Amino acid sequence: MEFLSKIVRVHIPDYLNSVPVPDSFGGFLDLTAGQWLHLFAFSGTVAAAVYVSVKPYLDKKDQKDQLVNLRIQKESSKVVNMVDIEDLGNKVCYCRCWRSKKFPLCDGSHAKHNEDTGDNVGPLVLKRKDV
């Protein structure tokens, strides 16, 4: 714990005091090449830390704004498909990627969707239990 305390109380303040931040804009003209390098290294580190901290929140916003259903029953406020369980037969595959031309049944469109997006979605397969 003493090691961490020394870093926070001694080394970080010493480093921040050594960063060559001029008092005015004209002071930037007086900086040497070594001071510019030190200033760029510090600025780059701060920018990278801010980017790494903010990036996950920006990605979530982009994901939230993307539509899942691009074309199926867009005139409806909610897409609902009812299927009588007695009509299923032995095996049926339902689409979960919303790309099927035979929606709600799967036509294998998820394979192209997965290839294009890197997703791993597949169909919902309902199968009668073998007795």
UniProtKB/Swiss-Prot annotation:
What domain of life does the UniProt record list for this protein's source?
A: Eukaryota
| Residues reported in the UniProt entry to bind [2Fe-2S] cluster | C95, C97, C106, H110
What is its subcellular localisation? Endoplasmic reticulum membrane
Give the matching Pfam families: MitoNEET_N, zf-CDGSH
Q: Which UniProt keywords apply?
A: 2Fe-2S, Endoplasmic reticulum, Iron, Iron-sulfur, Membrane, Metal-binding, Transmembrane, Transmembrane helix
User: InterPro entries, alphabetically?
Assistant: CISD1/2, FeS-contain_CDGSH-typ, FeS-contain_mitoNEET_N, MitoNEET_CISD
Query: What is its membrane topology?
Result: Single-pass membrane protein
Where does the chain cross the membrane?
Answer: 36-58
Give the cofactor binding note: Binds 1 [2Fe-2S] cluster.
> Hey, which stretches end up on the Cytoplasmic side?
59-131
Tell me the GO molecular function terms: 2 iron, 2 sulfur cluster binding; metal ion binding
Please tell me one Gene Ontology term that the record gives under cellular component: mitochondrial outer membrane
Names of the cofactor(s) = [2Fe-2S] cluster
Q: Which residues lie on this side of the membrane: Lumenal?
A: 1-35
| GO BP term (any one) | autophagy of mitochondrion
Q: Which family is this sequence assigned to?
A: Belongs to the CISD protein family. CISD2 subfamily.
Query: What is the protein's name according to its record?
Result: CDGSH iron-sulfur domain-containing protein 2 homolog B
* Source organism (scientific name): Branchiostoma floridae
